[in-house]
């Protein structure tokens, strides 16, 4: 009888804990997007096989594709300070990569080749002619691979702060595979993700990695990255 009572108590506590974490996750989700900073009047959607891809199109002239860094908090909003200037001489396409920003975030394993396929397909089906590309951070690696795969799709390529080859040469280790499995867990994994991508961690990212002078960052930029994550 005592054993049965312990099982019932454990079951009730587990259920209550799960419900509490679930509602906490919902609260964090709602709080992150309440300012709606990623809304865009120029919204367009490219329906790809793995999900809908959000992009904007501005200006006239030779085509130019802007690709943001590959971070969970990244989005096409990274280019907001220069895309209007570029649009004076180019037709500027700004993407939110699959799994980022306003694009779909399917529960799949994201690989370099997945993004190679996305970029090549987008240029062929949406832009339709050789395109100049500006890529930030990790995105530069799969742009180079995409160019090697389909060279006729590309004009000039510019990479901003490309990731060094030593980092690109790494493969997933036991720790990263374990973390991936943890994040993929329902409810608990979502809470872990929210912890890793909390606003304080986004602020730290801006301070230590994104700005030479951290005082130049704006609260709105931090909020936009937090919303994207």
Model features per residue range: what roles?
Residues 2-27:
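Hydrophobic alpha-helical topogenic segments used for membrane insertion/localization
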Residues 128-172:
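Conserved hydrolase catalytic core segment
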Residues 47-58:
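A short loop-to-beta-strand scaffold at the N-terminal edge of the catalytic core in hydrolase folds
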Residues 169, 194-229:
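Conserved alpha/beta-hydrolase catalytic His-Asp/Glu region
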Residues 76-78, 103-109, 168-171:
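Conserved catalytic-core motifs of eukaryotic protein kinase domains, centered on the activation segment
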Residues 94-134:
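Active-site loop/oxyanion-hole signature of alpha/beta-hydrolase fold enzymes
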Residues 57-102:
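Conserved HGGG/HGGXW glycine-rich cap/lid loop of the alpha/beta-hydrolase fold
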Residues 169-188:
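A catalytic-pocket lid/entrance helix-loop region that shapes and gates access to the active site
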